[in-house]
A protein has these predicted regions:
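Acidic, PIN/NYN-like endoribonuclease modules and their adjacent C-terminal/linker elements
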Residues: 1, 105, 109-132
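Short, well-structured N-terminal submotif of metal-dependent ribonuclease cores
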Residues: 1-38, 51-64
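Alpha-helical structural signal
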Residues: 25, 43, 63, 82, ...
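Short secondary-structure boundary segments
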Residues: 40-41, 101, 120-121
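Short acidic, glycine/proline-enriched helix-loop-strand junctions
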Residues: 66-78, 92-94, 123-132
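Active-site neighborhoods of divalent-metal-dependent phosphate/nucleic-acid chemistry enzymes
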Residues: 73-115
C-alpha cells in the first residue's frame, strides 16, 4: 500500500494562508486519500515553526487537530533511524540537509516510503518522489 510522508513545509503551507504554497497544499491534502504519515521530529519542527511565525494559539490548534484527526500517523524516530540519519548527514555534507531532514529520509527508507508531500528539494536529491 502506498503511503505519503508529509514534511514540515507542507504542513506549514496548509496552516499559513499567506504562504505562497497555501492553496496548492490545502487542495492536495484535501483531495488525496492515500495514508499520510509524518514523524515526531517533523511534528516538533512544524509546531515550533508555526509558533514562531503565527503564534502559540495557532500552533496549539494545529497540533491538537493533527493529533486527534486520525488521518495521519505520527511515527516515532527510532534509534536505528537516528544512526542512519547521522550516516546521511555525514555523507551529504555538501547538500545542506538538516538533521531533521536526515531523520525523515531514514524513516522513509526503513518504511519503504518513496513519496513525500514537500516543498523541499532535498527529498528529490535523495531520490524520493515529491508531490504535489
Amino acid at each position: 500500500m502506498k503511503r505519503l510522508f508529509i514534511d514540515t513545509g507542507a504542513w506549514y503551507a496548509v496552516v499559513d494562508k499567506k504562504d505562497p504554497d497555501h492553496r496548492v497544499a490545502k487542495h492536495f491534502l484535501r483531495n488525496n486519500k492515500i495514508p499520510f504519515l509524518t514523524t515526531n521530529f517533523i511534528f516538533d519542527e512544524t509546531i515550533t515553526l508555526i509558533r514562531s511565525r503565527l503564534g502559540w494559539r495557532v500552533a496549539r490548534d494545529f497540533g491538537e487537530r493533527l493529533k486527534q484527526s486520525g488521518f495521519v500517523s505520527i511515527i516515532a524516530v527510532k534509534d536505528e533511524d537516528e544512526e542512519r540519519a547521522w550516516e546521511i548527514f555525514l555523507k551529504y555534507r555538501d547538500k545542506d540537509f538538516s538533521y531533521t531532514d536526515c531523520t525523515s529520509f531514514a524513516v522513509m527508507e526503513r518504511l519503504k516510503i518513496d513519496m513525500a508531500f514537500s516543498f523541499d528539494s532535498h527529498f528529490q536529491i535523495m531520490k524520493f518522489q515529491v508531490v504535489p
